[in-house]
């Protein structure tokens, strides 16, 4: 008798234009710094910087550097990551797979491609 094995964790590269047409993801994570995120970001994207994600490799730091909402995410639901030019988001995607997420979308070209495609962005107004 052959038992079905769980699906192999996958990272899928997807252009911004295709991503906005795809089914919803449980979370859309912008891995840039807080400053970069505040300047402009995709709608519904939540900021969780790459350094914080990478620090989660250290078991003792894991629960200190990642927010509570992160630990409540279902590991089998799609998750997406974006950065400025798609140099940081692939590293974040790999780490998310190591943390047990099975479906991770990496937005190719990052926020630069997002803007070039004419997709909407938001800006956070930070009080000085």
Please state what every model-predicted region is.
Residues 1-27, 34-78, 87-128:
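Rhodanese-like catalytic fold shared by cysteine-dependent sulfurtransferases
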Residues 82:
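Short, surface-exposed ligand- or partner-binding patches at beta-edge/loop junctions that are enriched
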